[in-house]
Every structure is written in structure tokens, then in C-alpha cells.
A protein has these predicted regions:
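Extracellular/periplasmic solute-recognition and catalytic clefts
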Residues: 1-37, 60, 160, 164
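Acidic-aromatic pocket-rim loops
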Residues: 72-73, 147-181
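Short phosphate-binding/catalytic loops that engage adenosine nucleotides
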Residues: 136
């Protein structure tokens, strides 16, 4: 069945009429940061956000453990994949230190704009809780796809957004100067 959510898998596994095969995906779910906005234009703030997030906990909370942490737009099994998860590892103390170095007074208030998909809404809850531990108050803004496409993607009206990329890894997509990040 297409579009089976991770939380639906157990009902299929428990039914002898179905054989469940779980495999990898080329989808990449990312937390996009609008680096055109202050204070997100400071790389220390972006690194602090990355260090505040436990990717494994997000996968567990939003995907019931189905998924693998990544540190870039490459997924395990993709041509040229290099594990970069250690570049910005989960480290709460480092996150707090980077925020202080950037001169950020906490609480730092940001908006996390979420499309209507379960991975985004559930992942958003986990990320909001993790960011709070370092003094970042992320308010979720749940939007429908049309709003996300025009406001977030089109007009770059967001601080943070959680989105899955499923398009082919095509340099033409990622080299667009006005791509939403």
C-alpha cells in the first residue's frame, strides 16, 4: 500500500494476510532554516539549532523508529553517500554555548511552519521540545499545502520548516538561487 505511515505498520504486521517488507527510502526530511532572517543569518545560531536536535529522538517520535539520521541531503545507499552526522552532532551544552557566543538572549522566539503531513506535525512536536531545552521557544504554525507552497516555499516567509525532499538529487534543484532556503 502506498503512503503507509510508520504508525500504521503494526496493524499490517499483525494481520497474517499481509507480508510487510520495510526498506530504505530516498526521502530526506530536513529542518530548513531561513538564513536570510536575523538572527538565523548567523551560522552560530544555525549550528546551535542543529546541536540542540537529537535526530534519533525525532525519528523515534515522528517515525516510530523508521528512518536513519543523516547530516546532509544524501541518504545511506545513495551514490556518493558519506556519513556526515558527526559534523553537527547532538550536544545541548555546545548549543547553549553557540547561542551565547552569537549574543542571543534567551528565550529566542522562532516560528516552526509545518505542512499538513504526519511526519511534519509529529516531528515538529519533538523538535519544539528539544529546542526549548536550550532556550529556543519555537511556536508551531500548522499550514495547509497551498499556504506552505506559496508562503514558505514561494515567499520564504518562515523561520524554520520541516519538509521531506523526495525529488531526485538534481543539482539544478539545489543550485537555484531562490530555492526556499
Amino acid at each position: 500500500f502506498p503512503r503507509v505511515t510508520p504508525r500504521s505498520v503494526p496493524q499490517f504486521k499483525s494481520n497474517p494476510r499481509f507480508q510487510v517488507l520495510v526498506s530504505g527510502s530516498r526521502a530526506k526530511t530536513i529542518l530548513a532554516i531561513n538564513n536570510a532572517r536575523k538572527p538565523l543569518d548567523d551560522v552560530r545560531v544555525r549550528r546551535a539549532i542543529a546541536a540542540a536536535i537529537d535526530r534519533k529522538a525525532v525519528i523515534e517520535g515522528a517515525g516510530d523508529g523508521y528512518g536513519a539520521p543523516i547530516g546532509s541531503h544524501y541518504v545511506p545507499g545513495a551514490f556518493g553517500y558519506v556519513d556526515t552526522t558527526g559534523v553537527n552532532p547532538f550536544d545541548i551544552e555546545k548549543s547553549k554555548k553557540l547561542l551565547a557566543e552569537a549574543g542571543i538572549k534567551t528565550p529566542l522566539e522562532l516560528t516552526l511552519t509545518l505542512p499538513p503531513t504526519p511526519y511534519a506535525r509529529q516531528g515538529g512536536e519533538v523538535i519544539v521540545a528539544q529546542l526549548a531545552k536550550v532556550g529556543i521557544v519555537a511556536k508551531t504554525q500548522n499550514v495547509e499545502w497551498a499556504q506552505w507552497l506559496s508562503g514558505t516555499y514561494g515567499n520564504k516567509n518562515y523561520d524554520l520548516t520541516l519538509i521531506s525532499h523526495v525529488e531526485p538529487f538534481d543539482l539544478a534543484n539545489f543550485a537555484k538561487p531562490d530555492y526556499y532556503w
